[in-house]
Amino acid sequence: MALTYMNMALAFTVSLLGLLMYRSHLMSSLLCLEGMMLSLFVTMSLTILNSNLVLASMIPIILLVFAACEAALGLSLLVMVSNTYGVDYVQNLNLLQC
């Protein structure tokens, strides 16, 4: 079981590094965020299943709800930016520009 946790920690770390290194395009940032949320979901689900906590069994579902809201908001931002500027660069999201 420790190998599974190590793989999920590695997946989270790779997604975090991808988010930090490749942040020029909005789509790649959204994919890295989804990878982070997926690894957190699997880790939390495995932890709750192994510890037999009945009251905490709703926490992964709540995390999935937040991940779905984050994905919907991110995709709507992607559509807005690509319709306005024609590209999906993160630098176009600067609100201080006129």
Swiss-Prot record:
A GO MF term: NADH dehydrogenase (ubiquinone) activity
Major localisation: mitochondrion
Membrane topology label: Multi-pass membrane protein
Gene3D superfamilies (alphabetical): 1.10.287.3510
BP GO annotations: ATP synthesis coupled electron transport
Family in the record: Belongs to the complex I subunit 4L family.
UniProt name for this protein: NADH-ubiquinone oxidoreductase chain 4L
Native organism: Pteropus dasymallus (Ryukyu flying fox)
